[in-house]
Structures are given as C-alpha cells and as structure tokens.
Amino acid sequence: MEIIKFEKIDSTQIFAKNLKTPEPWTVILAKEQTAGRGEGRDFWYSPKGGLYFSVILPKSKIEDLQTLTILAAFIVAKVIKENFNLEPFIKLPNDIYLNGKKIAGIITENVIGKEVKFSAMGIGLNTNIDSFPKDLENMATSLNMKLGKEVDNEKILKEIIEELKEQLKTIGE
C-alpha cells in the first residue's frame, strides 16, 4: 500500500480525485486539511492532530457508493470500540458519534470518465484534537477528549485499511 503523506493540504479527497491512474489502496494522508470535505457542501474541521485520509478503492461488486460508505462507517466504529472500549453510534450513512457528538465522517465518490475510473473514500476521524472552535464544541468531540490521552493515528489508519481490504475481499468472493 502506497501512502502519500502531507503535512498540510486543502483536501485529501480532492487530491485523490485528481490522480490520473492511481493504484488501488493508495492512501493520501494529511496531518492537517485547510478545506476538508464532508457530504454535500459540508466542511470538515481538520486541524493538526486528527486522522484525515482518502483511499483509492479497488473495483468492487459493490456499485452503490452509499453501501461502501456504510461499510466504512461500521469499520471505523468497530476500530474505535475494539481499541478504546468506547460505544460509537453510527448515524447512517456516513457519520459516527460518541455521546451525541460527531467524531468521524466518511465520504465516497466516483471519478468518472467514459466509465467509472475509480472510487475514492475520504475518512476524517477526530483523534488527537484537544479542543474545537466555539461553533463546533457542542457538536464535535475527539478520542483525545474522551480518553484524556493521545492515540496512535498510524495504528488506527492501518487497522481501518486492513479491515476495509478484508471486507471488500470477502464481498468479492
């Protein structure tokens, strides 16, 4: 798996969608995003400390992007639960909450030419963020805020990607 790393980027999802012929499972990872994206026109607050990445998905038998997004939401929730003994809630199709506050969001988009060239999935997970702006503090949380300690972003990334690979392989069989 190739990982393209950035200290700061506008959006990992925009970068991923502009790749010409990316290999499946290429990951675009940023420590900070200046224009992180959510569903529709939503903005994803992406300061240093969070886990922000997009992954190029292989062609799959799942053609419905919403199904892929829901699958990823369950995987992210599972990783949170298994690693940190927390009880995330999934607001279908693409948001994950802890105690009523958003902790993660997922967006999946196709890049289309004459046909679908590839799909890019973006995941924003609030990990090592210790505070949010006033307009978000009642709506957003982070693993750091819930646990009182920093978490290993690389370990979480690896677990999410490995689980995605496993689930998509199983579906493809």
List PLM regions with ranges.
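Long, positively charged amphipathic alpha-helical accessory segments at protein N-termini or as interdomain linkers
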Residues: K20, S60-E63, T67-P88, L98-E173
